[in-house]
């Protein structure tokens, strides 16, 4: 009974082994052709953004300094108008041509909001991005009553950062970049400084703040509707304390660093007030969703030598795995951090079956190309071992002072502590660890993939050759088509007669040929007999 159980257990173990995939990426085989993985991370995608209003109060509260700063405040207002008025006019041109659409319900005779419509004829020319941003602008802008309440609240506040809660609406955060300087520096020193000096100090501070405003909103002058402002740029106007602003906005995401590095938090202008000098921004900050099971791998390649030629394996810089699937990975919209990979959109797209076979360990499926010019990597440290192309660079054992040679039948050299604890390669001294890779990769023990060319001239030449061959094949196909068309012109009875004639000719010709051959053979035999008798 025990033997039967053991046999059953062994059978199940073997069955599970056969059904279990051997793994997504075969790092062992890839290392033989100079490809190693230098990092893996989780995959996160930004999802739908949440919105919060932020007010930048450009004019500080100078009630206690009015007698000393009137000239500076007047000049500062003039400068602000040069920035704010073009933005206000562009916003008004868009919002005045967007109106709500209402429908009348059939059951109850009342109107219900259905959406907004853009008056394209009145607007004239607008890009798709501007139209989309204009609709979003209409949806996020405040109504006139809210603007009046906000203006009244801003005129009375003298805080650098203050939360203003509108009636029946969400909280609005108001920020003034110069107010702290006025409250903490100028007002306490009014008794020690002259009025002129206080005015000069405030004037310099306002001028500096104006340059920051201009650098932040200057690009918006060209396209105020669709221009977006990153939270990093916004932090300069907010006094540099970005954490305090995000905390006031209610953002408590655990992936704040990733969103900041990927510039996922954006701000867009929704209102400009040239009476009280403030700007209303709609800030969109997304949340991150981790795609479970997806791992992003970074690949790095090392060149290797075949005789006197230097090659390297052509593989993507980043790939992604999910279960047994391997996908290409577009890193253009992503930010890489130790905690994971953050992307603003889906970065996965299908990979060719041949490249998947290559990454799964079939080295003969991995394309290779000749090294031309300066190549980045001729050595790399992986798992504490040094993988080096010692045929192209100088490898030296620093411990013993001897040169590490690479035989012609080797394409790469793997150096570990059992061979040389401290290695000097290309002028860099590296201490290596215990062996994780074989000593060397021999050419006769590995199947290399097809050579390809990535140079523009070589690719053009190869394409020209391929086109010429296609033209030759096209001519042959055309000639064969002509033969087929001529065959189509023959009737079926003609084809039958031709076949009968060929068969009759064969029946008559073959016996005649046999008779001729026999006659010649008989003549040769008679000649030989006569010569023997003579």
UniProtKB/Swiss-Prot annotation:
Q: Tell me one GO biological process term.
A: symbiont entry into host cell
- In which broad location class does this protein mainly occur, judging by the first location in its UniProt entry? virion
User: What ranges does the record give for the region HRA, renumbered to this chain?
Assistant: 139-215
Q: Name one Pfam family in it.
A: Fusion_gly
For side Cytoplasmic, which residue ranges? 519-534
Q: Which residues are glycosylated?
A: 29, 61, 67
The residues the entry assigns to the signal sequence are 1-23
Which residues lie within the region annotated Interaction with hemagglutinin? 367-444
Span list, region HRB: 445-494
Transmembrane residues, as ranges? 488-518
Membrane disposition: Single-pass type I membrane protein; Single-pass membrane protein
Has UniProt tagged this entry with the keyword Zinc-finger? no
A Gene Ontology cellular component where this protein is annotated is: host cell plasma membrane
Post-translational modification, as annotated: The inactive precursor F0 is glycosylated and proteolytically cleaved into F1 and F2 to be functionally active. The cleavage is mediated by host furin during the transport and maturation of the polypeptide.
- Cysteine pairs forming cystine bridges in this chain are 334-343, 358-366, 390-395, 397-420
Which compartment or compartments is the protein found in?
A: Virion membrane; Host cell membrane
Spell out the family assignment given in the record's similarity comment.
Belongs to the paramyxoviruses fusion glycoprotein family.
What the entry says about domains is: Contains 3 heptad repreat regions, HRA, HRB and HRC.
Q: How does it assemble?
A: Homotrimer of disulfide-linked F1-F2.
What name does UniProt use for this protein? Fusion glycoprotein F0
Organism listed in the record = Measles virus (strain Yamagata-1) (MeV)
Recorded name of the encoding gene: F
């Amino acid at each position: 009974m025990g033997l039967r159980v053991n046999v059953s257990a062994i059978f199940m173990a073997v069955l599970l082994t056969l059904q279990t995939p051997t793994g997504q990426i075969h790092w062992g085989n890839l290392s033989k052709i100079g490809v190693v993985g230098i990092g893996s991370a989780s995959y996160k995608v930004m999802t739908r953004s949440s919105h919060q209003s932020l007010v930048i109060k450009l004019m500080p509260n100078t009630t206690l300094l009015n007698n000393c700063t009137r000239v500076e405040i007047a000049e500062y207002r003039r400068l602000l108008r040069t920035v704010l008025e073009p933005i206000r006019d562009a916003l008004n041109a868009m919002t005045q041509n967007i109106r709500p659409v209402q429908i009348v319900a059939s059951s109850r005779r009342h109107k219900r909001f259905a959406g907004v419509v853009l008056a394209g004829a009145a607007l004239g020319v607008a890009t798709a991005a501007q139209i989309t941003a204009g609709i979003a602008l209409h949806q996020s802008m405040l109504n006139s009553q809210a603007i009046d309440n906000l203006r009244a609240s801003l005129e009375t506040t003298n805080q650098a950062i203050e939360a203003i809660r509108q009636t029946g609406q969400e909280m609005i955060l108001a920020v003034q970049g110069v107010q702290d300087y006025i409250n903490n520096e100028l007002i306490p020193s009014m008794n020690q400084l002259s009025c002129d000096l206080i005015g000069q100090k405030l004037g310099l501070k306002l001028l500096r703040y104006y340059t920051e405003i201009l650098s932040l909103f200057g690009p918006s002058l060209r396209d105020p509707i669709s221009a977006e402002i990153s939270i990093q740029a916004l932090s300069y106007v907010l006094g540099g304390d970005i954490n305090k602003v995000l905390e006031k906005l209610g953002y408590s995401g655990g992936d704040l660093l990733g969103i900041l590095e990927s510039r996922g938090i954006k701000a867009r202008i929704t209102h400009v007030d040239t009476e009280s000098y403030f700007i209303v921004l709609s800030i969109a900050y997304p949340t991150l969703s981790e795609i479970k099971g997806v791992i992003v791998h970074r690949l790095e390649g090392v060149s290797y030598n075949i005789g006197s030629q230097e090659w390297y394996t052509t593989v993507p810089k980043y790939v992604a795995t999910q279960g047994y699937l391997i996908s290409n990975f577009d890193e253009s919209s992503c930010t890489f951090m130790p905690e994971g990979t953050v992307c603003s959109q889906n970065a996965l797209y299908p990979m060719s079956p041949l490249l998947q076979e290559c990454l799964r360990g079939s080295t003969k499926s991995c394309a290779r190309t000749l090294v031309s010019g300066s190549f980045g990597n001729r050595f790399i440290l992986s798992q504490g071992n040094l993988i080096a192309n010692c045929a192209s660079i100088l490898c030296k054992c620093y411990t013993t002072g001897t040169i590490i040679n690479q035989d012609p039948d080797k394409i790469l050299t793997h150096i570990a502590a059992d061979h040389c604890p401290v290695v000097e390669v290309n002028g860099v001294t590296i201490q290596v660890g215990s062996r994780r890779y074989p000593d060397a990769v021999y050419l006769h023990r590995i199947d290399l993939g097809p050579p390809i060319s990535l140079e523009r001239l070589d690719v053009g030449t190869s394409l020209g050759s391929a086109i010429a061959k296609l033209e030759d094949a096209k001519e042959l196909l055309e000639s064969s088509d002509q033969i087929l068309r001529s065959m189509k012109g023959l009737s079926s009875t003609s084809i039958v007669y031709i076949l009968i004639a060929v068969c009759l000719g064969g029946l008559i010709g073959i016996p005649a040929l046999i008779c001729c051959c026999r006659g010649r053979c008989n003549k040769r035999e008679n000649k030989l007999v006569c010569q023997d008798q003579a």
